[in-house]
Amino acid sequence: MENSKKKAAIGFIFITLLIDITGWGIIIPVVPKLIEELIHADISEAAKYGGWLGFAYAFTQFIFSPLVGNLSDKYGRRPIILISLFGFAVDYIFLALAPSIWWLFLGRIIAGITGASVTTASAYIADISTDEDRAKNFGLIGAAFGLGFIIGPVLGGVLGHYGARVPFYAAAGLCLLNFLYGYFILPESLDKDKRREFDWKRANPVGSFKFLGKHPEISGLITALILIYIAGHAVQSNWSFFTMYKFNWTERMVGISLGVVGLLVGLVQGLLIRWTTPRLGEQKSIYYGLAMYAIGLLLFAFASEGWMMFAFLVPYCLGGICGPALQSVITKSVPSNEQGELQGALTSLMSATSIIGPPMMTNLFYFFTHDEAPFEFSGAPFFLAFILMAISVVITYSAFKKKRKI
């Protein structure tokens, strides 16, 4: 690919991911109110449906991502990326027009089936990158996520002021514009002579878990990673419902708070980690990070004023020094010729926890906030997440202890 076309293609992939994440971020602040409107119930009941909507998206994406990845190997990246963008636009239109809650489920399932833009975009970047610029180009994925999660929720909160459905129309419009831009501009990255036949064995979403079973030496660290991912859904799936219920936050305030989350995560992942990991080392980074996560979650659980949530975001987001260090230790425990398989397995693992986490955390919120609850404790999901983080500290300590003995 010519250099000018290559730069344009990389720019398009960055914009694609940015719009994807921005579109997703736009709808987060208004989902609770839209669900309330459709089921004619309070925020507690809406949270339960919100968790199952998260499940519907994550489950279909888990099943279809390997299938879509295989299709991109056979037919090329361009058609898959374009179908993905169109699928997201259809999803957002379904959500905007939804006359009943079941339309939301149908929209989320459509998005889960077609929503392989990140996977296919990563493959696209791998196709057109050289060894010298590969890391820099892949860094654009992280940058798009960070920027999109700052812009999206804030924009969604502002648009939500004009109606719960307005942000969905905005997200659909962004995806359709991106689809049209890609249709006319985006070149194919995978040459026909490099394509391979579709194989149902490679399209098996469970197959990658077998790889982890071949490496019992990392089983403890993998278990800790699972608990961390599940605990994260106390914030990811529950934040909007909790803050609206507990502090009467508007969509605008929810959007601003999530924009702050995106900014803090970006600062920790982009800047702080470069300073902490060389000085603390990977093992201490994991311990300190897990401790910060746990402290932040415990404080969220018992927050009594809205401003406290902003203050408590600081220790929680500082916990972000843990993840990269933990993944680094895991990758060092696996031979270099198995790294691709390992990353595929870790991605499948994250998808699987996204199936479990949302309904677990939102149903727990419902259990402790509905009219017949044994007692009111809206912070229960954060408290459960705190316990999971504490257990992960014990597991990682035990795993490192065993490693030292080997």
Model-based region annotation:
Residues 76, 97-102, 114, 248, ...:
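Helix-breaking motifs and short loop linkers at transmembrane-helix boundaries and internal kinks
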Residues 2-7, 187-224, 245-246:
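Juxtamembrane intracellular "pre-TM" segments in multi-pass secondary transporters
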Residues 283-326:
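C-terminal transmembrane helical hairpin of 12-TM major facilitator-type secondary transporters
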Residues 62-101:
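Conserved MFS/SLC helix-loop-helix module at the cytosolic interface between two early adjacent transmembrane helices
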